[in-house]
């Protein structure tokens, strides 16, 4: 049965936003609302938003299992609310709604409530009320951590109908509302996804202890202890340690990831975990424990958007398996209402540049469709309505001076949601935004060439190939990268126009694309299949962005092969260039060269990261510590995870796919691998590709779900179409 939420601001009146004016102390706040319920209630709906984050209780029972809720947005554009069904929680007569609000991305905790029983408004936030008081959380910050004093936490009886008014009984007041429109949260909630035990403890010379969880992840810790009242235990979080074993927080860029718990002195023991912060870490330095840590003193809790795994990949090569696990852990660590760049330092933003390299890998591993729909709307809200300019992050925290086509992940991610998940309505909704973005880029060109090259380019190649005092590639011209991506965005928008039946726009975009390709070829082609700089990135961007004339594609691909072999099969590319390098070499039949690179622990590469202790992807190809750009949990170099599925297993949607109803199966039987097995829970059903060497031949078994068909391609053989079922081929 369909039910609409509160769709218009008028539906919320007379409910208002309440909080406390003035400077915020950093403390979390409790809010209490008492209301009367009849003996019989057929339908109960609580509409609730708390910024930055909230948790709610009715008669002492927690509503839902979401944490760090709601997801961040640009509060001047949208404010998300949750809807709760209170069935089974209400009692006849007086009831208590309790809300716990922390700063989150809004910083100042504010709440808005509307409760309806059988369609009648029975509780709301009023200009003066409800009663409010401080919780035991004395300080909470996304970046800085949380400080909790258990001695100051109010007795929970105030959450019960028989309990007292929330001490100290002070009423909050009406607060100027955020300008954004109230919208129901349609994105997966952030939840506690799993628990991790401490792998080992290290005692430092000064008596502090360092816990090693053996895995870098995003979340927080649960602390268990028995201690006298006033005992203060601090938890300091980091991704790596100093030579003396203490944690190193230099890469957090100035913020101290510190949780502090002050015990109330309960002889039966105390258990605590934070409510309104999270960290990216592997190591925790613990100070103030009254004794030696026990087996359950500290437990790691993995926290993130609840996007279930939908891809599984396995080979007989343990290094490749570990690389895929590293990629998956990194992606899982960076889903927090938006796809973030990192979970640990003072950033944690939805960078469009990162998503340009990451989005296919992400949706092969996790069902991120709903999360990415929300994020694409965040981008649309951040886009300049007059110029079509798209900023680097969404929700927007940083607007560059230049137009940069790396932000065309806005278009590509939407198109991939169509190919992978059958998304149609969003393409229609955002099509005007894509057109505006293409116009914006065109206006920044000189004769279809983006001469200023944008801000980012091919970001963070190996250090020796970076430009002077920059993380951009010094091997490939910025304007080549920017113009190729501009053309790619126009080509995708033309495909969307064709799918939507927008014939006039399709024709106009096709003409624009032809002009870009001609200008690109005239500006950067040097003859004999060579492009300016003759670098891996130059060839890869030209090929994968569709800038190479069809009659030259084979020759240019051969030049890329020669370049890569001359570079001893070591990459010289940045985040996007690496993705395109993997694809371009595989498309011309040289997946063997990519396998040679991936199956290595030498620098630069993913195996090198693992050989140097990584459990999640680094931001740089180098092992870096200290301040600066050196996150150790950063998904933008993870495109190899998509390559495993697309080329080793050979599972990839066709250009005319609509939710994987049509796809290609074209595995690469590379020498040195004896078995590859991958499955993907597609929108159409489960797809499996499993090949294994047996007695000098390759036995390949693949499964096509119902109502789908696959084009099966093998080297040296004409493509054939297969329908649903499990099929076996021996090569």
Label every model-predicted segment.
Residues 526-630:
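Extracellular polysaccharide-recognition and catalytic grooves
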Residues 30, 81-83, 269-270, 341-346, ...:
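Active-site-adjacent structural elements in folded domains
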Residues 53, 110, 121-127, 131-133, ...:
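Active-site acid/base region of carbohydrate-active enzymes
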Residues 3-345, 353-354, 370-371, 387-398, ...:
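Extracellular/oxidizing-compartment recognition motifs
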Residues 351-363, 372-373, 404-416, 479-494, ...:
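Well-ordered alpha-helical segments within folded domains of soluble proteins
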Residues 136-162, 184-194, 510-511, 592-731:
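Non-catalytic C-terminal accessory modules of carbohydrate-active enzymes
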Residues 54, 62-65, 69-70, 379, ...:
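Active/binding-pocket-proximal capping segment
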Residues 3-7, 66, 484-500:
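Conserved, charged catalytic cores of large soluble enzymes
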